[in-house]
Amino acid sequence: MPLDPVALTADLVRCPSVTPEEGGALVLLERILTEAGFDCRRVDRNGVPNLFARWGRKGANRTFGFNGHTDVVPVGDAAAWTRDPFGGEIADGWLWGRGATDMKSGVAAFVAAAVDFVQETPPDGAVILTITGDEEGDSVDGTTALLDWMATEGEAMTVCLVGEPTCPERLGEMMKIGRRGSMTAFFTARGVQGHSAYPHRAKNPVSAMARLIDRLASHELDKGTGHFDPSTLAVTTIDTGNPATNVIPALCRATVNIRFNDRHSGASLIRWLEQEAAEVAAETGVEIGLSAKISGESFLTPPGELSELVARAVEAETGLRPEPSTSGGTSDARFVRAHCPVVEFGLVGKTMHQVDERVEVAQIEPLKAIYKRILKDYFT
């Protein structure tokens, strides 16, 4: 009997797997996949839950991989939800709950597709599923741990599809062939505290920070590249910790986030930020320090065999030719791309991370059909 992706999605939503809790989600999937003949291994690292599953021969020349996550973001105010966020309730044509869109429906669809495919038409090759419980958190011991373990064990994927939600409005509209890089810069300006009536006796870190922020925000990083929109810089915090209106504080902190295309690297942007900070410091006499966190570099899987395989399957099942895009935030594809070519395709993601997160039930079975067709075409 075919594996029902709708029922599996509901079962997964009922698992309260808020990062870093496993919540029973990977235990459920491991049982299903083991019963279907997959070789399953828990690859937990530093308490972070991860699941590896392979059907077929280790080291096969053609190995198709799926990647996804079962961890979810916190519910927030549970009283604000129309339905139980971990109830997996189906009502009004929707399946409700935290993770319904991001991305338990995607995981359920590719698990169901893989199980049905290998049982109905066993391929000459292998199918690997890598599913983590650490995508919404720090992403340090999740997919990276799985890929590290695979390298040690001689396991490899030839290509990989990440089942994150990718479509803006309708299933089939968009797939991701790359992602922008992301980095966060933390600035600390240290001046000299003083009375606001005597500004000449102080060194105002707020004024210095404002000058720096104005320079950064008004600078055009680029005009975009062949497959990427222009890079963006957003100021996300400015803080002095100063409740007094007649005191010039000694300290001011600010944070900016940069989403960057393939014209830049995290290192090149840090060099630019350091130069800008040094120039403002020289102009104002205020010391400005910088630390930065690079969450991921930009990457691109150039249009080719893998993207065409996915596009054909999507068009065959939905009638829509998916637009190849690099928009949006980061995903674990940024880690997979160092292992093998990777493309992302999944459901409409309009309600992910929101109160009353939900997925249209009528989309889940078609997503399974798309994934199953991709497998069939890949191994034909």
From Swiss-Prot:
<feature type="binding site">
    <location>
        <position position="69"/>
    </location>
    <ligand>
        <name>Zn(2+) 1</name>
    </ligand>
</feature>
<comment type="subunit">
    <text>Homodimer.</text>
</comment>
<dbReference type="GO" id="GO:0019877">
    <property type="term" value="P:diaminopimelate biosynthetic process"/>
</dbReference>
<dbReference type="GO" id="GO:0008777">
    <property type="term" value="F:acetylornithine deacetylase activity"/>
</dbReference>
<keyword id="KW-0862">Zinc</keyword>
<dbReference type="GO" id="GO:0009089">
    <property type="term" value="P:lysine biosynthetic process via diaminopimelate"/>
</dbReference>
<feature type="binding site">
    <location>
        <position position="353"/>
    </location>
    <ligand>
        <name>Zn(2+) 2</name>
    </ligand>
</feature>
<dbReference type="GO" id="GO:0008270">
    <property type="term" value="F:zinc ion binding"/>
</dbReference>
<keyword id="KW-0378">Hydrolase</keyword>
<keyword id="KW-0028">Amino-acid biosynthesis</keyword>
<comment type="similarity">
    <text>Belongs to the peptidase M20A family. DapE subfamily.</text>
</comment>
<feature type="binding site">
    <location>
        <position position="102"/>
    </location>
    <ligand>
        <name>Zn(2+) 2</name>
    </ligand>
</feature>
<dbReference type="Pfam" id="PF07687">
    <property type="entry name" value="M20_dimer"/>
</dbReference>
<keyword id="KW-0220">Diaminopimelate biosynthesis</keyword>
<dbReference type="InterPro" id="IPR002933">
    <property type="entry name" value="Peptidase_M20"/>
</dbReference>
<dbReference type="Pfam" id="PF01546">
    <property type="entry name" value="Peptidase_M20"/>
</dbReference>
<dbReference type="InterPro" id="IPR005941">
    <property type="entry name" value="DapE_proteobac"/>
</dbReference>
<dbReference type="InterPro" id="IPR011650">
    <property type="entry name" value="Peptidase_M20_dimer"/>
</dbReference>
<dbReference type="InterPro" id="IPR036264">
    <property type="entry name" value="Bact_exopeptidase_dim_dom"/>
</dbReference>
<feature type="binding site">
    <location>
        <position position="164"/>
    </location>
    <ligand>
        <name>Zn(2+) 1</name>
    </ligand>
</feature>
<dbReference type="InterPro" id="IPR001261">
    <property type="entry name" value="ArgE/DapE_CS"/>
</dbReference>
<keyword id="KW-0457">Lysine biosynthesis</keyword>
<dbReference type="GO" id="GO:0006526">
    <property type="term" value="P:L-arginine biosynthetic process"/>
</dbReference>
<feature type="active site" description="Proton acceptor">
    <location>
        <position position="135"/>
    </location>
</feature>
<dbReference type="GO" id="GO:0009014">
    <property type="term" value="F:succinyl-diaminopimelate desuccinylase activity"/>
</dbReference>
<comment type="function">
    <text>Catalyzes the hydrolysis of N-succinyl-L,L-diaminopimelic acid (SDAP), forming succinate and LL-2,6-diaminopimelate (DAP), an intermediate involved in the bacterial biosynthesis of lysine and meso-diaminopimelic acid, an essential component of bacterial cell walls.</text>
</comment>
<feature type="binding site">
    <location>
        <position position="102"/>
    </location>
    <ligand>
        <name>Zn(2+) 1</name>
    </ligand>
</feature>
<comment type="pathway">
    <text>Amino-acid biosynthesis; L-lysine biosynthesis via DAP pathway; LL-2,6-diaminopimelate from (S)-tetrahydrodipicolinate (succinylase route): step 3/3.</text>
</comment>
<dbReference type="InterPro" id="IPR050072">
    <property type="entry name" value="Peptidase_M20A"/>
</dbReference>
<feature type="active site">
    <location>
        <position position="71"/>
    </location>
</feature>
<keyword id="KW-0479">Metal-binding</keyword>
<feature type="binding site">
    <location>
        <position position="136"/>
    </location>
    <ligand>
        <name>Zn(2+) 2</name>
    </ligand>
</feature>
<keyword id="KW-0170">Cobalt</keyword>
<dbReference type="GO" id="GO:0050897">
    <property type="term" value="F:cobalt ion binding"/>
</dbReference>
<protein>
    <recommendedName>
        <fullName>Succinyl-diaminopimelate desuccinylase</fullName>
        <ecNumber>3.5.1.18</ecNumber>
    </recommendedName>
</protein>
